[in-house]
């Protein structure tokens, strides 16, 4: 049985002590309250103002404007336009009943908002005290100006009732922001790319240069000073820098016109996977071989930059909308990717000029050497055929290029050897990024001296067995025909601030000289023979000396790793004028939608059409005569041949100052730093100075 706990009792002495402590605490509290009351009466206003002066009022962000993207002539490809968000302070409207209807009517009439929904929003229990309700986004400057004009009409023009109505519009204010606009819609879409409302760049220049295009937001602060007066402090935004690209919208439009024409011409083929298109990919690059500047770059996967998630031109939009996010990402990536820089494939015979250049430069062959083609070569018991299985017979080096002879190239490769072949692949920058200022550049894949054997060497000589991108090939080919100088291809000429001042100029970058001018001269002659008499005849342009090379590559089935019977990438790369090239055009057609993909000369003809328009546009004169019979052979009328044509004897148009008016820049200012070719570099040194694909930042510019 538990004992009962006795109640604890304080003795009288302890009770007196507790009472004393309680009395003391009570006295202190009374004194503190009296002190607070005294301070409040005597100095309350002073301290209230000090508190108010430390409190922030009416603080807002002032958004920066993202920089523009222009072509080389100042045509705007991307820009940011100021827009406004309509904000409503419901609490301010509810201060008086008289404010409700005038405010609702002003919003409804000026911005097309529903009056019933507005009344409900303003008076609803959960929003009536809200001071921040977004009513409408992306309101234009014109809409905002019209609203402000409607509530600032002079009293002289209004009745008393209308004045009261106007003065009772309360709680409406605006926040500034910017939206990205693309005035030329889909033009150069895979190059320009797009950005979202948060100024995050997606693909293209918008992505690569996003840190340069972006600026820094400003801020406006409002404070009450000690006199309870509102003072404002404004930190202005720093707008983003703008890009002056190397693109020429006129050349870009010409290129895209003929891509579209070919896409439509072949669209009736039987390949249902192409969704009514003429080929899986059709792509063209136009470059200045003397500077590395890209005049045009386009594919048949263009899309409206203002509506990039609309992929209905290639896919069933309803089916895409039903996919998971991961599956949609695959579709969008396929649509937005740039075939010219991100897709690596076997080049085929367009690589042959590089093999011959290397053999000539190393002395492995001489320009006057001859080779006998019997239609095939046996390489370690493996028979490798020439395209002409009956053989071309005896050929010179130039004729081997003209005839696109695999047999002769294998013999040349044997003389060159594995070590030198691999070295010159690297010297021409295959297997490495070119450093072009676009994201997601593919480096392709090469054999090394360790894993390349006789068969691999033989097939590599004519562009089979390794992969390359279009940008790698056109940069290398430009070096073959321009005297031997390898320039880094680039997309941006200048970076400018929002006042138009130049922040940075991207001068041409000469990386190396893999071959001599004398070797380049031999290749110029061989490539011209290929257009006049060989496989590139369909690329002939009346009045101009054109040199070029065709290419046909059987694709690899990614599932089996074997040759994909009947599926080809066909191409043509050409320079004009071939004796002193000002422009190089590279056209690729991936799986044309026809029964026999190797026939038809589609890229050759497309290249010819492009050159026929851009050569006169670039003020490059026609120097060669031609006959009606020659025109008829290629299905060209004399009117087409002479449209826009200029000759060396014609006087160019000049301005009032006597300066020649040029419709496009075919040259850039002389750069004393690149007038002489650099000394030959080691393999490691060749990679130095080649930027990675991370993109340039504002900090990079500030550090220069």
What are these regions, as identified by a protein language model?
Residues 78, 84, 125, 224-234, ...:
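Beta-lactam-recognizing serine transpeptidase/beta-lactamase-like catalytic domain environment
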């Amino acid at each position: 049985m538990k004992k009962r706990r006795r109640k604890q009792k304080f003795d009288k002495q302890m009770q007196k002590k507790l009472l004393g402590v309680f009395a003391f605490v009570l006295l202190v509290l009374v004194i503190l309250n009296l002190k607070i009351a005294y301070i409040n009466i005597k100095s309350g206003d002073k301290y209230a103002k000090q508190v108010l002066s430390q409190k922030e009022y009416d603080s807002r962000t002032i958004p920066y404007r993202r920089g523009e993207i222009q072509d080389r002539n100042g045509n705007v490809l991307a820009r940011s336009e100021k827009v406004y968000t309509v904000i409503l302070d419901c609490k301010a409207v509810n201060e008086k009943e008289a404010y409700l209807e005038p405010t609702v009517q002003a919003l409804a009439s000026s911005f097309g908002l529903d009056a019933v929904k507005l009344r409900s929003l303003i008076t609803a229990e959960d929003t009536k005290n809200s001071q921040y309700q977004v009513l409408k986004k992306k309101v234009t400057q014109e809409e905002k100006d019209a609203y402000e004009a409607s509530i600032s009409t002079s009293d002289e023009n209004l009745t008393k009732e209308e004045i009261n109505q106007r003065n009772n519009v309360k709680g409406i204010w605006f926040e500034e922001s910017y939206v990205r606009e693309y005035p030329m819609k889909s033009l150069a879409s895979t190059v320009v790319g797009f950005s979202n409302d948060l100024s995050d760049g997606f693909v293209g220049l918008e992505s690569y240069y996003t840190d340069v295009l972006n600026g820094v937001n400003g801020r406006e602060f409002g404070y009450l000073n000690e006199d309870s007066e509102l003072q404002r402090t404004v930190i202005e935004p720093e707008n983003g820098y703008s890009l002056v690209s190397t693109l020429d919208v006129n050349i870009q439009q010409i290129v895209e016109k003929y891509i579209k024409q070919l896409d439509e011409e072949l669209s009736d083929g039987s390949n249902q996977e192409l969704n009514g298109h003429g080929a899986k990919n059709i792509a063209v690059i136009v470059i200045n071989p003397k500077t590395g500047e890209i005049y045009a770059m386009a594919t048949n996967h263009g899309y409206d930059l203002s509506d990039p998630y609309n992929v209905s031109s290639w896919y069933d939009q309803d089916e895409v909308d039903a996919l998971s996010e991961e599956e949609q990402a695959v579709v969008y990536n396929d649509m937005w990717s740039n075939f010219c820089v991100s897709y690596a494939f076997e080049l085929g015979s367009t690589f042959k000029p590089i093999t011959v250049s290397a053999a000539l430069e190393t002395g492995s062959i001489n320009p006057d050497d001859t080779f006998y083609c019997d239609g095939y070569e046996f390489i370690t018991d493996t028979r490798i055929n020439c395209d002409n299985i009956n053989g071309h017979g005896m050929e010179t080096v130039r004729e081997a290029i003209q005839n696109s002879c695999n047999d002769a190239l294998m013999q040349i490769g044997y003389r060159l050897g594995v070590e030198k072949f691999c070295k010159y692949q690297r010297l021409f920058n295959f297997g490495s990024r070119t450093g072009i200022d676009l994201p997601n550049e593919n480096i392709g894949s090469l054999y090394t001296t360790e894993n390349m054997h006789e068969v691999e060497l033989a097939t590599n000589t004519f562009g089979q067995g390794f992969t390359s991108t279009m940008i790698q090939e056109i940069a290398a080919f430009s070096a073959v025909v321009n005297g031997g100088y390898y320039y880094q291809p680039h997309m941006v000429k200048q970076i400018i601030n929002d006042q138009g001042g130049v922040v940075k100029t991207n001068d041409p970058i000469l990386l190396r000289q893999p071959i001599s001018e004398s070797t380049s001269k031999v290749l110029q002659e061989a490539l011209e023979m290929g257009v006049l008499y060989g496989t590139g005849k369909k690329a002939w342009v009346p009045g101009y000396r054109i040199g070029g090379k065709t290419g046909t590559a059987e694709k690899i089935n990614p599932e089996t790793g074997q040759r994909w019977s009947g599926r080809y990438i066909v191409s043509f790369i050409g320079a004009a004028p071939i004796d002193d090239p000002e422009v190089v055009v590279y056209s690729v057609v991936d799986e044309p939608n026809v029964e026999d993909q190797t026939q038809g000369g589609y890229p050759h003809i497309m290249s010819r059409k492009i050159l026929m328009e851009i050569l006169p546009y670039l003020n490059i004169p026609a120097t060669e005569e031609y006959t009606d019979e020659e025109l008829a052979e290629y299905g060209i009328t004399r009117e087409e041949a002479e449209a826009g044509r200029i000759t060396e004897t014609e006087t160019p148009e000049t301005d009032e100052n006597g300066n020649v008016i040029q419709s496009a820049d075919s040259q850039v200012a002389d750069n004393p730093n690149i007038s002489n070719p650099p000394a030959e570099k080691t393999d490691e040194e060749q990679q130095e100075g080649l930027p990675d694909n991370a993109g340039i930042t504002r900090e990079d510019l500030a550090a220069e």
